């Protein structure tokens, strides 16, 4: 029998500093329906900046 699809969705976290750097991660759509914003390190400018969620194409 086939396994049911999970609630987890792959997302891309894009730097708000417009450097083009991004992280990929997963999030649970049911527990967190809003867009994710998290502060992470951007190695291009060597600073902590806010990363915003974007869909993976």
From Swiss-Prot:
Gene Ontology BP annotations: translation
Key words, A-Z: Ribonucleoprotein, Ribosomal protein
GO MF terms held by the record: structural constituent of ribosome
CC annotations in GO: cytosolic large ribosomal subunit
Coiled-coil ranges from the UniProt annotation: none
The keyword Nucleus is assigned to this record: no
Protein family (similarity comment): Belongs to the bacterial ribosomal protein bL33 family.
Name assigned to this protein: Large ribosomal subunit protein bL33
Organism of this sequence: Shewanella loihica (strain ATCC BAA-1088 / PV-4)
Gene name per UniProt: rpmG
